A protein has these predicted regions:
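Start-of-helix register in tetratricopeptide repeats
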Residues: 1-2, 35, 68-69, 102
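Canonical tetratricopeptide repeat
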Residues: 5, 39, 72, 106-109
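Short coil turns that delineate tetratricopeptide repeat
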Residues: 31, 64-65, 98
Length: 118
């Protein structure tokens, strides 16, 4: 069975918990391991379970250090109110893809919040 593709199909129905279970099986079988870990983490973002997404993003990054992986990791840290780590990972994402306007906006928002904060 192609767990990764099945997980993608389930993800598209927004059944994120079932998709996570299938992505986990895909990752265990080394079936597009980085993509499986990344997509699992994105499912956790949809479920607003950012703390569960963070280690999955780190594991995916260890296998494939892509800009979008760092961007979503930074987003999770921002949602967990960890501004220093969010800024670090947004900057890393932007270093890998300096044409990403969303990343630039996120960095500017974080920097602005530092200037406003008491």
């Amino acid at each position: 069975m192609d767990y990764f593709q099945k997980a993608n199909d389930i993800y598209n129905t927004k059944d994120y918990n079932r998709a996570i279970a299938l992505y986990k099986k895909a990752a265990e079988m080394k079936d597009n391991e980085a993509g499986s870990l990344y997509n699992s983490a994105v499912c956790f973002i949809h479920l607003k379970e950012y703390e569960k997404a963070i280690p999955l993003f780190h594991n995916a990054i260890n296998l494939r250090p892509e800009s979008k992986y760092f961007f979503n990791l930074a987003y999770c840290y921002a949602m967990c109110l960890n501004k220093p780590k969010a800024l670090y990972y947004f900057n890393t994402a932007w270093t890998l893809n300096n044409e990403d306007e969303d990343c630039e906006k996120a960095i500017n928002l974080l920097l602005k919040s530092y200037r406003i904060a008491p």
